[in-house]
């Protein structure tokens, strides 16, 4: 229930941000701006707690946001952040930014592929993953979100939406173990 209510609050703000971006030809700029915000929030649990705390004065939140984003985000995007503070929705900032990016990808026929690898991928490997995902999905382009997990031992796991393609050594060993455990 909580997730549904949260989603119902996030979607209209993300759509409004996308509409603003499109009307002023700022979709790419807002994508960068939302990425910056997501990076700031991911790097600081204190910032997340500060913004989410309803007891903190809204003006203090605005000042912190201005200081963190001065000359880094477009003025319209900063105004949007101030609006979220005024409407007491700043606690939804990360979700709104993520949803904005998802809406923009959908609009541009770009899919997000979450790639987990045992080691850092080379440029050639990244290109191969992008081409494989394009073939699988029919998307115009692919955005990669890469994470490193040494426990995979080797290979990659690619997640696109609800589809998972497990080409990891750990996955192969698990499948082999399951097949060997079955009676003949």
From Swiss-Prot:
It is found in: Cellular thylakoid membrane. Its main location: membrane. The keyword RNA-binding does not apply. The keyword RNA-binding does not apply. Signal peptide: none annotated. It is a peripheral membrane protein. InterPro entries: ATP_synth_OSCP/delta_N_sf, ATPase_OSCP/d_CS, ATPase_OSCP/dsu. It comes from the Bacteria. One of its GO terms (molecular function) is proton-transporting ATP synthase activity, rotational mechanism. Keywords: ATP synthesis, CF(1), Hydrogen ion transport, Ion transport, Membrane, Thylakoid, Transport. It holds the Pfam family OSCP. F-type ATPases have 2 components, F(1) - the catalytic core - and F(0) - the membrane proton channel. F(1) has five subunits: alpha(3), beta(3), gamma(1), delta(1), epsilon(1). CF(0) has four main subunits: a(1), b(1), b'(1) and c(10-14). The alpha and beta chains form an alternating ring which encloses part of the gamma chain. F(1) is attached to F(0) by a central stalk formed by the gamma and epsilon chains, while a peripheral stalk is formed by the delta, b and b' chains. Belongs to the ATPase delta chain family. F(1)F(0) ATP synthase produces ATP from ADP in the presence of a proton or sodium gradient. F-type ATPases consist of two structural domains, F(1) containing the extramembraneous catalytic core and F(0) containing the membrane proton channel, linked together by a central stalk and a peripheral stalk. During catalysis, ATP synthesis in the catalytic domain of F(1) is coupled via a rotary mechanism of the central stalk subunits to proton translocation. This is ATP synthase subunit delta. It comes from Synechococcus sp. (strain PCC 6716). The gene is atpH.
